[in-house]
Amino acid sequence: MKSSELGKDVIRKELPLIPKSPGVYRMLDHKDVILYVGKAKNLPNRLKSYVAEKNHIIRTARMLSQTFKLEITTTANESEALLLEANLIKKHKPKFNILLKDDKSFPFVFISNKDQWAQVTKHRGKKDKEGFYFGPFASAGTANWTIKMLQKIFQIRVCDDSTFKNRKRPCILYQIKRCSGPCVDYIDKEDYKKSVDQAIQFVSGKSRDIQKNLSKQMEEASEKLDFERASIFRDRIKSLNIIQSSQRINEANLIDADVIAAYKESGKTCIQVFFYRSKQNWGNQAYFPKHDPDQSLSEIMSSFLMQFYENKNVPKLIIINTEIEDKKLIEETLSKKENSAISINVAKKGTKAKVIAMAEKNAKESLNRKIYETNNNKNLFEGVAKKFDLKNGLNLVEVYDNSHISGTNSVGAMITFGNEGFVKKRYRKFDIKTKGNEQDDFAMLKEVLTRRFKRAMLEKGNYLTLPDLILIDGGKGQYSSAKEVLDEFGLHDLPMIAIAKGKLRNSGDETFFYKGKSFKFDKNDPTLFFMQRLRDEAHRFAITSHRAKRAKGITKSLLDQIDGIGSIRKRALLNHFGSARAVESASFDEIKSVEGVEEKVAKKIYNFFHE
């Protein structure tokens, strides 16, 4: 029996029971792990094709050879089947499907309108607040840049409501002309509302109208001899002109569209997505879907579109660079999802063709960079394996480091590096929990490794897969401590290397410990540079995590350190001033004015911060 006959037999047995209906089918292996999710207009007809075909492509034959079980879900129509398929693929990540990796929600710029003093912030997730949402932006950096521009031109507040309500004097943003000081009534409500309305117009792509309004306001102020006010409008016009000249060109005059171009080479694909909203280019993002080398660009694009838009708002127009077989079905499905007509165009001429050509050029360049980096990383892995005589190949390395100051806010950190670079979704930080371990580097390392591998053993495949190599920041002592943990979990064959700095802590003078031996490399050795890079990234992540924990602890504990300040008074002070730092900056009279804080307690608080 051919190996693919196994899956064919499973399908043959199920076929008589399957209704002639649209739906989704799932192929599972002997451990009930989903191998593949597919959709069909007519389930029996689609599944019969697997049985009838004699010469399957390698990927399909391999899938059928591992198929022990078939599951079916019927749907009301083909559009529902398409949506369910995309949802199941994203949820289960079957190994024989095209997979969109690193898909995340995009940031929006949010301008609140729940009160008279609107605030501008960056927003991710559900749009459950009352106000105006602008986006999506391709990255947090693009969204932050837009917020900075709104601050610079329109001087809208970015502080949270608690800080805003309890401000007694303006913050530094007022001093550098990034806020108009509404918290201390330096601007009246009517003028502030005008600024907010103009900011909304600006992000909506109506900057010419704003320029006219600002010019008019400047002239009116000049006529009234209010030159200080006129200078404010003059500065805003100047800032607006600078920003307009630096904004990306939208040659095709796209109002609400995504431009999506795929480029395939050497069995790998990059898909570039450019976001156009309100006639503005709001950046682009590169994706590298996982797929078999023999899958066509059309297949990859179709699968990408459904997975990409499964949890995102869809623009009215999607411009792509390759024909897809199920274009009409995808249009219909996305239109139903949005309750609005969605159009997918393959741009072949005119300005839209120029835009898609630019996106395709970006996709090609991104893919070439990715292939180069992947090949380079593989070479670096091979260099490490050769230097330390590691028999099995390297694809994944975990690096560990600790950070603390005199045993306080102790944190352990783990970072991961794979063939495609640093794997951020596998980064972990460990708050040290065991009393007495906080100041003991060896005990901290043992606790971190114990927690990491204990969970891996308990949860099996549901937690992080085991690495091919562990790298420890430390010397012989750390190596011995880590080895004890690995032996305890039966991981005797998991390679581990410790990297210790020299006596003068100079980079390039590192000593490596492995299996009871010590090694030193030439200062110009690429393997040394690579392992330094891994060590430094783990150190950076540990330090960052420690600082965040320390900052949180400082904010939390400042008021807790004052005798006589219980939870009720603490809450009253924080509600009034917004933060412990604001209490520190307050005068004695300001502290005394807080409800529930009598003169004696106010004096104690003031003296605590100023003695």
Swiss-Prot record:
Gene3D superfamilies membership: 5' to 3' exonuclease, C-terminal subdomain, GIY-YIG endonuclease, UVR domain, UvrC, RNAse H endonuclease domain
Pfam families according to UniProt: GIY-YIG, HHH_5, UVR, UvrC_RNaseH, UvrC_RNaseH_dom
Compartment(s) where it occurs, according to its Swiss-Prot or TrEMBL record: Cytoplasm
Domain GIY-YIG as annotated: residue spans: 20-98
Alphabetical GO biological process terms: nucleotide-excision repair; SOS response
The organism's place on the tree of life at top rank: Bacteria
Keywords, sorted A to Z: Cytoplasm, DNA damage, DNA excision, DNA repair, Excision nuclease, SOS response
Membrane-spanning parts: none
Molecular function in Gene Ontology: DNA binding; excinuclease ABC activity
One CC-aspect GO term: cytoplasm
InterPro entries assigned to the protein according to its UniProt record, in alphabetical order: GIY-YIG_endonuc (IPR000305), GIY-YIG_endonuc_sf (IPR035901), GIY-YIG_UvrC_Cho (IPR047296), RuvA_2-like (IPR010994), UVR_dom (IPR001943), UVR_dom_sf (IPR036876), UvrABC_protein_C (IPR050066), UvrC (IPR004791)
Residues of the UVR domain: 208-243
Record function comment: The UvrABC repair system catalyzes the recognition and processing of DNA lesions. UvrC both incises the 5' and 3' sides of the lesion. The N-terminal half is responsible for the 3' incision and the C-terminal half is responsible for the 5' incision.
Cross-referenced PANTHER family: UVRABC SYSTEM PROTEIN C, UVRC/OXIDOREDUCTASE
Subunit comment: Interacts with UvrB in an incision complex.
Family statement drawn from the similarity comment of this UniProt entry: Belongs to the UvrC family.
Protein name per its UniProtKB record: UvrABC system protein C
Organism: Pelagibacter ubique (strain HTCC1062)
